[in-house]
Amino acid sequence: MVAAVLRLLFVRHGQSEWNALGRWQGQADPPLSDLGRVQARTAADAIDTAAKGAASPVAGIVSSTLVRALETATIISDALGVYPLHLEPDLVERNAGAWSGLTRSEIDEQFPGYLANGTRPRGYEPDDVMLDRTLRAVDRIIERFAPIDEPATVVVLTHGGVIYSLESHLGAPFQRKPNLGARWVLVCNGALQLSSTTTLIDAASATTPDLL
């Protein structure tokens, strides 16, 4: 018997105050900007429409514990009436080490050549560590919501670094996500299958941070 498909929608949070200032966040914890809150409300409508269109209702919402993701998740949870909101610490953004809080120009000044040649500073979270915790989080999400008898959607509010790590693991080339950019991942019989990308807000209100 083929199990029903669990659809995971990995969503980058709304614009944060540091996104608006061009500061690399890492695991620093700035809140959403006013625009980020508007983006989250718009995204809730898009998620509802997508889930209904696929006959795959939203069964749950999971969030990183960082406030910019948690605020986004709370707005979406309230708009959709989906409770409780589940927290997952392993969904937090990549640790940016000494770059946390810096702008691109400040990084270029303090760490000349690093961005251009792919060198990372002390304290920057390695790719393998990032992927290990990302997959642990995904495993726990699947364990919580599967198996299922009918198709269902779980919305996962997280960060660019987490989504890029998962996409790379599943064979997708790097493509920068805007705030409220998202990637569908399907779970069928326990296996992960990369699906489409989407942006949950219109182009006029989209913001694409230059740095994580």
Locations of regions flagged by a protein language model:
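Short, active-site-adjacent cap segments at secondary-structure transitions
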Residues: 17, 68-70, 93-94, 162-164
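Acidic, low-complexity terminal tails and accessory targeting/binding regions
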Residues: 2-7, 43, 94-106, 147-150, ...
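A short beta-strand-loop-alpha-helix capping motif that often carries His-Thr
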Residues: 125, 153-164
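Beta-strand elements within well-structured catalytic alpha/beta cores of enzymes
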Residues: 7-11, 62, 148-158
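Short, well-ordered beta-to-alpha junction loops that form the rim of enzyme active sites
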Residues: 14, 64-66, 90, 156-161
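Active-site-proximal alpha-helix that buttresses catalytic centers in soluble enzyme cores
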Residues: 2, 6-82, 110, 127-131, ...
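Glycine-rich phosphate-binding loop signature in dinucleotide/nucleotide-binding domains
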Residues: 50-57, 141-152
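Phosphate-handling substructures
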Residues: 76-136, 196-197, 211-212
